[in-house]
Regions:
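Hydrophobic alpha-helical transmembrane segments of multi-pass integral membrane proteins
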Residues: 62-71, 93-125, 298-338, 355
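Juxtamembrane and boundary regions of transmembrane helices in multi-pass small-molecule transporters
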Residues: 13, 17, 146-149, 153-208, ...
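Hydrophobic mid-bilayer segments of alpha-helices in multi-pass membrane transport proteins
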Residues: 1-7, 18-38, 61-67, 122, ...
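Alpha-helical transmembrane segments of multi-pass membrane proteins
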Residues: 64, 95-108, 134-151, 307-320, ...
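Membrane-interfacial loop-to-helix junctions in multi-pass transporters
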Residues: 55-61, 86-104, 130-140, 208-216, ...
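Core transmembrane alpha-helical segments of multi-pass membrane transporters/permeases
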Residues: 23, 27, 35, 46-79, ...
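Interfacial loop-to-helix junctions that mark the boundaries of transmembrane helices
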Residues: 12-25, 52-56, 88-93, 177, ...
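Re-entrant/interfacial helical elements at transmembrane boundaries that shape
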Residues: 117-128, 145, 156-170, 293-294, ...
Length: 413
């Protein structure tokens, strides 16, 4: 709450939601959190905050940010990004660029099982395409972010799918069968919207001849990600490939490329700071019983199946907004969701689907979520500028609401 008050308050004060640094709002709210944590000396309070920031999942994400920054900057400087953009522009007419990017993000995230890996692979390409045709960079980046959550929500190897199905005691296949009733209609509607928006794009960009050698780093990253290789290993291989391409085909020396990698790592500094501060705040919130308090208060007064499903959806969404991690949110709420599900006779497969889907929707609309932060950092834009263009999560949230109101799919009620 303090963070939201700080961020919204400062934004209103300066009259611009796009210029207020997230890091400042997190620093102020973190100081408040440490100061108001009771019954502990200051040193112990700082240790609680630091343990939250040093969570293994968070540090793993930091390593991804570092390697992603190095790869993105190196690929850009050696010409790999420009070559990939030229290939895309030569293959797809202007009206098909948005739908093509969205489908690519959906497919890659479905194969990889992670939205972050998809964002890392496609955001520089989306940014380059927008720049070439004079399109909105936040809009094109949002297409990638939205599509990345399609697969994250459906994939059998996604950590959110695994967490949701295990917590509810159902199979991943059954949860998938429920999810497609929500995700596929939403994706088709948004795909149609992108065709309409793309059809209005009028551009006569003269694409240069495609330099296939320069495309290899991005092609390698996408193929290895689809194969299912660990994202850190994929990025390392991508960096090596970009380095080799730079030495062999680009007019670049090794020392310059090391400098480019350093620039890329430096560009991720703000993202890493925000991630650590947000995780430290979560540590304080959990220590002070904030998550338990939210769950206890929100789970009271449930009436009927629709009320139970609505409460499960809201619970996981609110906890996700506090933790900025959809997997942790599902794990935190999963046990209580199963109790509610059994008490009100809900189908465990539908409950697992609601947990996964609503956590993904909530993750899209917080400016400090890993996916939006990563995309904004790679594109050099504000996180807030991306949020209004996230059409797919809006549509997915609407499908969840309709599925609760009209109780579909009937087989899973």
């Amino acid at each position: 709450m303090v963070f939201l008050m700080m961020y919204v308050g400062l934004s209103i004060f300066v009259g611009d939601f796009y210029t207020v640094p997230l890091s400042v709002a997190f620093v102020l709210s973190s100081v408040w959190g440490v100061a108001t944590t009771a019954r502990l000396p200051l040193t112990e309070r700082l240790k609680v905050f630091s343990r939250g920031a040093a969570n293994s999942d968070v540090i793993y994400m930091v390593w991804i940010f570092i390697l992603a920054g190095a790869f993105a900057m190196l690929a850009q400087k050696v010409g790999a990004t420009e070559a990939t953009v030229n290939l895309t522009l030569s293959v797809l007419p202007a009206g098909y660029l948005m739908p093509g990017l969205f489908l690519a993000a959906c497919f890659i995230s479905m194969a990889v099982g992670t939205s972050v890996g998809t964002v890392v692979a496609l955001t520089p390409v989306a940014m380059g395409i927008a720049g070439e045709i004079g399109g909105s960079i936040p809009m094109f980046v949002a297409v990638v972010v939205g599509g990345s959550f399609f697969g994250d929500n459906l994939s059998f190897i996604s950590d959110t799918t695994i967490a949701a199905t295990r917590s509810q005691g159902c199979s991943m296949r059954d949860k998938f069968n429920v999810n497609i009733w929500l995700t596929v209609p939403a994706a088709l509607v948004i795909l149609a919207i992108y065709f309409v928006i793309g059809g209005s794009v009028e551009t006569q960009v003269a694409t240069e001849s495609v330099d296939w050698q320069l495309i290899m780093p991005y092609l390698l990253v996408i193929v290895l990600a689809v194969v299912g290789l660990n994202v850190l290993l994929v990025l390392l291989i991508g960096i090596v490939a970009a380095f080799v391409v730079g030495l062999t085909y680009a007019d670049t020396d090794a020392l310059s490329m090391l400098g480019f990698m350093g620039e890329g790592v430096d560009s991720m500094g703000n993202l890493i700071v925000v991630t650590l501060l947000a995780s430290g705040m979560l540590g304080l919130i959990q220590h002070n019983g904030g998550i338990s308090f939210l769950i206890d208060r929100m789970s009271r007064g449930i009436k009927g199946k629709r009320g139970a499903q609505t409460m499960i959806s809201l619970l996981v969404a609110v906890v996700n907004m506090c933790t900025a991690n959809n997997t942790i949110a599902i794990i935190t709420v999963g046990g209580l969701a199963r109790q509610i599900s059994e008490k009100y006779g809900l189908d465990s497969r539908k409950t697992a689907s609601l947990l996964d889907t609503c956590s993904c929707v909530a993750q899209c609309f917080i400016p400090y979520g890993a996916q939006v932060l990563m995309a904004a950092s790679l594109a050099g834009i504000s996180t807030v500028s991306i949020l209004p263009h996230l059409y797919y999560p809006f549509a997915l949230g609407l499908m969840v609401a309709l599925s609760i109101i009209f109780q579909f799919p009937k087989r899973y009620h």
